[in-house]
Amino acid sequence: MRLKDKVILVTASTRGIGLAIVKKCAQEGAKVYMAARNLERAKEIADTLQGVNCVYNDENKPETFSSMVEEVVTDAGRIDVLVNNFGTSNPGKDLDFVNTDPQVFLDTVNLNLRSVFMASQAAVKHMAVHGGGSIINISFVGGLVPDISQVAYGTSKAAINYLTKLIAVQEATHCIRCNAVLPGMTATEAVESHLSDDFKNLFMKHIPLGRMGLPEEIAEAVCYFAGDASAYTTGQILTVSGVFGLATPLYGDIANSKAKR
C-alpha cells in the first residue's frame, strides 16, 4: 500500500472530490482525518471506512485551522500530509470582471486563500519538527486559464497556485513538499446538480478526452503527491482536466469539422 501508516488530514471532505480523496488514502493504508463543519455527517462516513477519524474545522472560523491540526497531532503524534480541498464559489454573483460585486470578489478570495494559508501554516510548524511532510492544494484549471465568468473563484485559485510554489521554495529546507492538483470539470454531485445539460455538453466539446473527470481520478493524483514516489517532486502544478485548457480555443469547433485548411 502506497500510503501505509501516513497521517493525512483532508479538509472539506464529506462529499465530492474531498470524500474521494479520503476513501483512496484510506484504501492505500493511511490514517486519515476528515476535517468538516458537520461532524455528525463526517462521523457517519468515517464509521463506514477503516482508519478514518474526524476533526472539526469551520472555514468561517479562522481559529479552527490551528485547532484541527493540533487535534490530529495530539491523536496521531504527527501530521505527514495536508490536503487543502476547501473551495467556495458564488456562481450567481461571481460573474465577469465588470459585473461582479466587489464584496463577492473579496469574500471569495479571502475564504479560499485563507483556508490554504492558515491550514498550511499550522501544519508546517509540526511537519518541520517531525522530519518533513507533504502539502497538496486542490486548485482549479481556471486558475491557469481565464474564464468568461467566475472572476473571484479563478483569481483565488491562481493565488493558491502561486502560494503552492512559494511554500515549496521556502519550506524545502525542512523537507516539506508542496504541490497542487488542478481538476477540470469533474463529475461531482455539485456539478451534476448545478449545471445544465446544455452547458455541460457545450463544455465537453472543449475537453479533448471527451468526458468529465471522476473524483477518483483526482484522488489518484493526490495519492501520488502524498506518497514516497513523489519524494523529489515539489512546487508542481498538475492539471487533471482531460487536456482542457491546453488545446486551442477553437478545439471544440474544429475537432468534428470537415473544414479543410
Residue ranges and their predicted role:
Residues 125, 169-170, 231:
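Alpha-helical segment proximal to the catalytic Tyr-Lys
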Residues 140:
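Residue(s) in the substrate-gating loop at a strand-loop-helix junction
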Residues 93-97, 101-106, 203:
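Substrate-binding pocket helix/loop in short-chain dehydrogenase/reductase
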